[in-house]
């Protein structure tokens, strides 16, 4: 895997933009975001293990994904607002209430572009309550995308 990612953020608007190139076709990268069997293999940053995946991949369908660090579980959920395979995915994102976890609803927009057989994925998340929350998510998503890249590189197929 070639790690090629860039990050931009805007303190005034509390937005996060990450761009990463994956050595995989965009159809597969998109599927990794919407297929529960794929999600169960890569979702979460290093040191976390997916513990549950429930997705209804229709416009307006709900999703909920859990992960654990071995001591505690963390759950996030939202609603799919737009699914345009393999080009664009839009969903709401919110952490379940937990002490120390920000209570904020964010919006995630992901675009997938073909780049000579590879996929350029642009991840855009808006609606952070604080710059600190945005910055924490930046580190988490970067590590999560490393997990996605490792999953893609493994060549593991789902049933």
Task: Pin down the residues of each PLM region.
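Hydrophobic pocket/interface hotspot
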Residues: 29, 39, 63, 80, ...
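Hydrophobic ligand-binding cavity/cleft-lining segments
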Residues: 1-49
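Intrinsic-disorder/low-complexity, polar/charged segments enriched in Ser/Thr/Lys/Arg/Asp/Glu/Gln
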Residues: 13-19, 26, 50, 62, ...
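Short strand-connecting beta-turns/loops that link adjacent beta-strands
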Residues: 70, 85, 115-118
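Hydrophobic/aromatic beta-strand elements that line small-molecule binding cavities or substrate pockets
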Residues: 20, 52-53, 76-82, 106-113
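Beta-strand/loop substructures that line and gate deep hydrophobic ligand-binding cavities in soluble
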Residues: 90-142
């Amino acid at each position: 895997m070639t790690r090629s990612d860039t990050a931009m953020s805007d303190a005034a608007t509390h937005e996060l933009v990450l761009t990463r190139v994956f050595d995989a076709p965009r159809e597969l990268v998109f599927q990794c975001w919407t297929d529960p069997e794929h999600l169960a293999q890569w979702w979460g940053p290093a040191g976390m293990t997916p513990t549950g995946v429930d997705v209804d991949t229709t416009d307006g369908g709900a999703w909920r994904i859990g992960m654990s660090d071995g001591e505690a579980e963390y759950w996030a959920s939202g609603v799919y607002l737009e699914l345009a395979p393999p080009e664009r995915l839009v969903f709401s994102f919110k952490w379940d209430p937990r002490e120390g976890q920000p209570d904020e609803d964010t919006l995630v927009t992901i675009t997938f572009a073909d780049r000579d057989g590879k996929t350029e994925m642009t991840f855009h998340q808006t609606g952070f309550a604080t710059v600190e929350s945005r910055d924490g998510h930046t580190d988490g998503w970067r590590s999560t995308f490393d997990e996605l890249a490792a999953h893609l590189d493994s060549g593991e197929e789902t049933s």
